[in-house]
UniProtKB/Swiss-Prot annotation:
Species: Bos taurus (Bovine)
Gene encoding the protein: HEBP1
Keywords attached to this entry: Cytoplasm
GO cellular component: cytoplasm
PANTHER family, per database record: HEME-BINDING PROTEIN 1, HEME-BINDING PROTEIN-RELATED
Protein name: Heme-binding protein 1
């Protein structure tokens, strides 16, 4: 636990590499199209719980792994944003399922430490292109869902994206009270 806190407060912070391809807006919604680099990710999946509750279960596991709860006992530093996939129902409500994706820092990409917790998996993920919109505050599932709905409305028929899931992201540690950065990412579809 101490390693997790130390890493969160004093560890290095790396930004997940991406390139802005374009920017747009409609009404009050500003968005970017980004090409995000792939790589190795530490993932935790939680089902049968509402998103906010599932996130409270999954995040400490990822933070402990990054903070040194791994086979090498290494605190790896942070990569932001931490993203989690949510799965909307047909009515827009979020299903009781979530998957946290933490991009392993570049220094450890070729040989990431093995997690001590069996619920954490190391997965390779291809690069993705996303439509992203940003907002502040302490975000909850309802905030992410509202922002996703606004982004979908802003994109309307101008962009194709996955509809079975989207990513919610956070850039800040929980103890940061002001200037928080959250985003919703709709994954561009090739269809």
């Amino acid at each position: 636990m101490l390693g997790m806190i130390k890493n969160s407060l004093f560890g290095s912070v790396e930004t997940w590499p991406w390139q802005v391809l374009s920017k747009g807006s409609k009404g009050d919604v500003f968005y970017e199209e980004r090409a995000c680099e792939g790589g190795k990710f530490a993932t935790v999946e939680v089902t049968d719980k509402p998103v906010d509750e599932a996130l409270r279960e999954a995040m400490p596991k990822v933070m402990k792994y990054v903070g040194g709860s791994n086979d090498k006992g290494l605190g790896m530093g942070m990569t932001v944003p931490i993203s989690f996939a949510v799965f909307p129902s047909d009515d827009g409500d979020l299903q009781k399922k979530l998957k946290v994706w933490f991009r392993i820092p570049n220094k450890f990409q070729s040989d990431p430490p093995a997690p001590s917790d069996d619920s954490i998996k190391i997965e390779d993920r291809e690069g993705i292109t996303v439509y992203s919109t940003q907002f502040g505050g302490y975000a909850k599932a309802a905030d992410y869902a509202a922002q996703a709905a606004q982004l979908r409305s802003a994109l309307e028929s101008t962009a194709k994206y996955q509809t079975d899931f989207y990513f919610c992201t956070g850039y800040d540690p929980p103890m940061k009270p002001y200037g928080r950065r959250n985003e919703v990412w709709l994954v561009k579809s090739s269809e």
